[in-house]
Design a protein with these regions (language model features):
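Metallocofactor- and cofactor-centric catalytic cores in central/energy metabolism, strongly enriched
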Residues: 2-134, 138-143, 148-150, 154-155
Length: 155
C-alpha cells in the first residue's frame, strides 16, 4: 500500500507555546517569536472558567466569544510570525472560532499582511443540550482532538 503522507525531513519540528490560559502574559508571544527558531507557535487559552467568561461575552455580543487578548497579540506579532515563517496554532477562537478568523483576516488586511487563516469548529454542543440531557448550560463543548488542526495546517 502506498502512503499519501508527504515525506518529512529528519529535522525536528520546533514548537513553542505562548499561552497556558486566557490572561497569560501578553508579552509571551513576542518573546517566543524572538527567542529562537520555531516552526509552530501554539497558544492554549481555554479552560472551564474561560468558557464561562467567553459565554458571558457572547451573551453581550454574539460576535464575541473568543479570546480578545489573542487578537491584540496578533496585532503586535503577526508580521513577525510571517517574516519568520512560524505557523500559529491556537484555540483562542473559543466559542466563536469563525468570528476570530474573520477578525484575524480583517486585522491582516489592516496591517497589509498576506496571511492564511483557518479555523476548526464543530465542538459547540449547546444546541444539543436537551438531547444530551445537559439542561440549559451557558456553554457545552466537546474535545475534538487534532484531526481538524492537521487539516487546517494542510490547507
Amino acid at each position: 500500500m502506498t502512503s499519501t503522507t508527504p515525506a518529512r525531513s529528519d529535522r525536528p519540528v520546533r514548537i513553542g507555546n505562548a499561552s497556558g490560559f486566557y490572561g497569560d502574559r501578553f508579552s509571551a508571544m513576542r518573546e517566543m517569536l524572538e527567542g529562537g527558531e520555531l516552526d509552530y507557535l501554539t497558544g492554549d487559552y481555554l479552560a472551564e472558567l474561560t468558557m464561562l467568561i467567553l459565554g458571558r461575552d457572547r451573551l453581550k455580543d454574539p460576535a464575541l466569544g473568543y479570546a480578545k487578548t489573542f487578537l491584540r497579540q496578533m496585532e503586535d506579532c503577526l508580521g513577525l510570525a510571517i517574516d519568520k515563517g512560524v505557523r500559529i496554532v491556537s484555540n483562542a477562537g473559543g466559542l466563536n472560532p469563525h468570528g476570530l478568523a474573520v477578525a484575524l483576516r480583517e486585522l491582516a488586511d489592516k496591517l497589509g499582511i498576506d496571511a492564511s487563516v483557518a479555523f476548526v469548529d464543530g465542538d459547540d454542543l449547546v444546541d444539543r443540550a436537551d438531547e444530551l440531557g445537559l439542561g440549559t448550560p451557558l456553554t457545552a463543548n466537546a474535545y475534538l482532538g487534532a484531526f481538524g488542526i492537521k487539516s487546517a495546517l494542510d490547507s
